[in-house]
Amino acid sequence: MQKTKMIFTIGPASXTEEMLVXFI
């Protein structure tokens, strides 16, 4: 989960990161 969060944080997904993390 942490790895995915880091990848999303680095990417252009800022707000979407929260939704994905949550989802994952």
From Swiss-Prot:
Catalysis: reaction(s): pyruvate + ATP = phosphoenolpyruvate + ADP + H(+)
Give the keywords, sorted: ATP-binding, Glycolysis, Kinase, Magnesium, Nucleotide-binding, Pyruvate, Transferase
Enzyme Commission code: 2.7.1.40
Pathway the protein acts in: Carbohydrate degradation; glycolysis; pyruvate from D-glyceraldehyde 3-phosphate: step 5/5
Question: What does the sequence similarity comment in the record state about its family?
Answer: Belongs to the pyruvate kinase family.
Assembly information from the UniProt record: Homotetramer.
Q: What is this protein called?
A: Pyruvate kinase
